[in-house]
């Protein structure tokens, strides 16, 4: 059985479906957060980059806000905060704050699975076949927030000068993450 959660973003109501197991997992996280809320002071700000499978141009500009609203609903359901979302037909950048008790990998997995199901069922994304297995996630100080927000806002203009593969590689290298070229941007 599935539950529906309402999300409002960019003046659009978007219904998102989340399976019962995911709902129970979030309830456990919320209870855990509430239990430790008065004891911990943590700021987690992530810049997450998701790429479509095989870099397909699957996110049409005229419908990207629907996807962004849907993703915002998922973020809200995890008690996260979306500061900015934007991208191009083959990738999405998100700047989010997540609860300290929520592992980034678990969140990204749920974000990709849920949004993938939604996009495949939505006629506005006929070219979408899934997200790439890889993703990039970088932590930042709250003092970097405005700089990253502006960077994400400027995606359309930025990609007139630089291809996504180059941008992606630069982000990864700037964050001192080792790249294995045998697997970099290669989908099975």
Regions found by a protein language model. Give the residues of each.
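Basic nucleic-acid-binding interfaces
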Residues: 2-188
């Amino acid at each position: 059985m599935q539950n529906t959660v309402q999300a409002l973003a960019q003046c659009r109501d978007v219904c998102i479906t989340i399976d019962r197991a995911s709902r129970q997992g979030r309830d456990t996280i919320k209870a855990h957060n509430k239990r430790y809320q008065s004891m911990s002071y943590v700021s987690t700000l992530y810049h997450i980059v998701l790429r479509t499978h095989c870099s397909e141009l699957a996110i049409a500009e005229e419908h990207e806000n629907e996807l962004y609203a849907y993703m915002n609903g998922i973020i809200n359901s995890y008690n996260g905060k979306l500061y900015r979302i934007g991208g191009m037909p083959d990738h999405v950048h998100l700047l989010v704050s997540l609860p300290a008790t929520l592992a980034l990998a678990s969140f990204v997995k749920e974000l990709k699975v849920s949004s993938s199901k939604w996009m495949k069922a939505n006629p506005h994304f006929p070219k979408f076949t899934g997200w790439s297995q890889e993703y990039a996630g970088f932590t930042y100080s709250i003092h970097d927030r405005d700089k990253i927000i502006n960077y994400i806002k400027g995606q359309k203009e930025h990609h007139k000068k630089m291809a996504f593969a180059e941008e992606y590689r630069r982000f990864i290298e700037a964050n001192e993450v080792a790249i294995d070229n045998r697997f970099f941007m290669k989908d099975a």
